[in-house]
Amino acid sequence: MTTSHILGFPRVGAKRELKFAQERYWRKELAEQDLLDLAKALREKNWKHQAAANADFVAVGDFTFYDHILDLQVATGAIPARFGFDSQNLTLDQYFQLARGNKDQFAIEMTKWFDTNYHYLVPEFQKSTAFKANPAHYVNQIREAKALGLNFKPVIVGPLTFLWLGKEKGEAFNRFDLLNQLVPVYVEILNALVAEGAEWIQIDEPALALDLPAEWVEAYKSVYAELSKVNAKLLLATYFGSVAEHAELLKALPVAGLHLDLVRAPEQLAAFEDYSKVLSAGVIEGRNIWRANLNKVLDVLEPLKAKLGERLWIAPSCSLLHTPFDLEVEVQLKEKNTALYSWLSFTLQKVEELNVLKQALNNGRASVQAALDASQAAADARATSKEIHRPEVAERLANLPKGADQRKSPFAERIVKQNAWLNLPLLPTTNIGSFPQTTEIRHARASFKKGELSLADYEAAMKKEIEYVVRRQEELDLDVLVHGEAERNDMVEYFGELLDGFAFTKFGWVQSYGSRCVKPPVIYGDVTRPEPMTVRWSQYAQSLTNRVMKGMLTGPVTILQWSFVRNDIPRSTVCKQIGVALSDEVLDLEAAGIKVIQIDEPAIREGLPLKRADWDAYLQWAGEAFRLSSMGVQDDTQIHTHMCYSEFNDILPAIAALDADVITIETSRSDMELLTAFADFKYPNDIGPGVYDIHSPRVPTAAEVEHLLRKALNVIPKERLWVNPDCGLKTRGWTETIDQLKVMVDVTKKLRAELA
């Protein structure tokens, strides 16, 4: 019989129950025991869903109050020493302080979990880090599952991935040197799981899909030689990419089974066809929302079953953490777009798809014919739907003139034409885009969406807010103004709602980090722009002032990265479609007299593939899509872009190739370190490094802003330097915003006078 299992499950609950409970707990509106009880009930529901879908094991230990890598820091005694907490006796309050900071210590740094939109808390390793086992997190969840009479499989991230994901702090050393101290602690944790009756233990090593240094790869041999001494069968789980290059190493490891992601990297199966142990085939997409074509999946699985027999296991490609909970609650979507609804599959539907595959493998396809027919019908309808496939979109992309993504003239010529009409002072000041989204703005938007506020009244409220933003900027004496984006709920959702080819769910939430969830748009069809999206708002804002008003758009790569993307054509094609659609908006803005236009790309680095060999291809099409979004503009129209905090050093040629006239970047928290790379590279165009951190309500001192600006002037010619905050001001309050911007403008004027 074929075994089916789940690698991990969403934690937040079908209706984000955990999020709301956490936030009430943080506001001291919910007792700790009530939060613990709610979490226990959520775990039980998750396990019962898995059991109801006929999974042979339920995943245990994957549930977390904030982040599974933070749980591992606690379990191994590796929490940051700077907090002064005892990892063996950590309270729930202290656990949350690690994640959120307290009055004495900033929070543990967060970063993206591989190339997903989930964020983990980055372990801080020191030369003196002393690991100590505390398996309570896993043991307690095992006991709950046992009490329910469920067959369970603990899930834990492996030691090499855990160490790889961390950072060295304090005295210089290599965290790899900690491995020998970490492994015995892992053995102790695994033994505690065995003592609770664990027969199989899933150890996740997604780092194997990265470009690991040779010594790290080699270490898998000795590490797993030690771990395999525990009295349980180990399933080594890999995902997010191919591990074929390590096939010989992995086949020789003393583990009882291996999980492969056959959705992201189906071609790697060939390298493991002679594997002699359990092979877990990850065949249901764990990080996108499309229904599988089950007949096609069975075409792959049936020959495997013939070869492996009971050694074949089936599973989703990775944890289902990255997919929304239940499609069935999307009643509005079903009514509005029945076809699209039939092409989707959320977590509960995915475990059912897995169950159908299991029945087909064990009892033949005829035993689940109705389910297979429904799956095939959905796949066939999707392949031919006129709602998805618009010939005019493909034709437009195919017939773009050669060099469509290139500006008419080089930057050196464009900037002369731009400066002639802009007539800006040295060190021009501007904002990144958004201004505070007040309670009044949110209330007006909610009332309008509920039908309690008419369109005319809603637009009047937004115009009033835009005028307020313009007047404040004039009073502050900023040079290039923005309209503040009062009318936008979210920088991607706003455009998705106005572009064809996008759809939205009501409950399609996925965890981004901690209690923060996001509801990504669904790109299901060819993308077009039926009518102008931002022009009238920017025109209205410009009508209020004689100063230059900047148009604001979200770029194609960011829209792609922060959406659930169709999987029937290449991502590169989808991205270029978005770029071309945005170009229509850019030309309309230009025609309306808006001749400074910002196209935000905060997510361009996030899209980098896990393996460096694939970077060039990605950067090539991402850059082309960005440039297509401003194709056809005149030389005297100034294109800006903004990028959030990033390591740019290794992709600077690609950033320069975007050929934006002005790039603004988030640099204040790194003390302008990023700028050195731009200077060394001799970045050719204008640049606006952020001079204060908008993530904090704190008002910077004049000395701090001056220090950063002087550092910037040391490496960027004064003629090419702009002055701006790090990011948009959406999450700030008005009082601190005015105070912060005043400091920025005053310091700029002081330096201007000095440089004149």
UniProtKB/Swiss-Prot annotation:
Pathway: Amino-acid biosynthesis; L-methionine biosynthesis via de novo pathway; L-methionine from L-homocysteine (MetE route): step 1/1
EC number of this enzyme: 2.1.1.14
Keywords: Amino-acid biosynthesis, Metal-binding, Methionine biosynthesis, Methyltransferase, Repeat, Transferase, Zinc
Chain residues that bind Zn(2+): H642, C644, E666, C727
SUPFAM superfamilies documented for this protein: UROD/MetE-like
Binding site for L-homocysteine: I432, G433, S434, E485, D600
Cofactor note: Binds 1 zinc ion per subunit.
Catalytic residues (positions): H695 (proton donor)
Broadest EC class assigned to this enzyme: transferase
Positions with a binding annotation for L-methionine: I432, G433, S434, E485, D600
Pfam families with a match to the protein in the record: Meth_synt_1 (PF08267), Meth_synt_2 (PF01717)
Keyword Methyltransferase: yes
Cofactor(s) the record lists: Zn(2+)
Keyword Magnesium: no
Reaction(s) the record says it catalyses: 5-methyltetrahydropteroyltri-L-glutamate + L-homocysteine = tetrahydropteroyltri-L-glutamate + L-methionine
Gene Ontology BP annotations: methionine biosynthetic process; methylation
GO molecular function: 5-methyltetrahydropteroyltriglutamate-homocysteine S-methyltransferase activity; zinc ion binding
InterPro entries documented for this protein: Cbl-indep_Met_Synth_N, Cobalamin-indep_Met_synthase, Met_Synth_C/arc, UROD/MetE-like_sf
Function: Catalyzes the transfer of a methyl group from 5-methyltetrahydrofolate to homocysteine resulting in methionine formation.
Xref: PANTHER family: 5-METHYLTETRAHYDROPTEROYLTRIGLUTAMATE--HOMOCYSTEINE METHYLTRANSFERASE (PTHR30519)
Homology family: Belongs to the vitamin-B12 independent methionine synthase family.
Protein name: 5-methyltetrahydropteroyltriglutamate--homocysteine methyltransferase
Native source species: Haemophilus influenzae (strain PittEE)
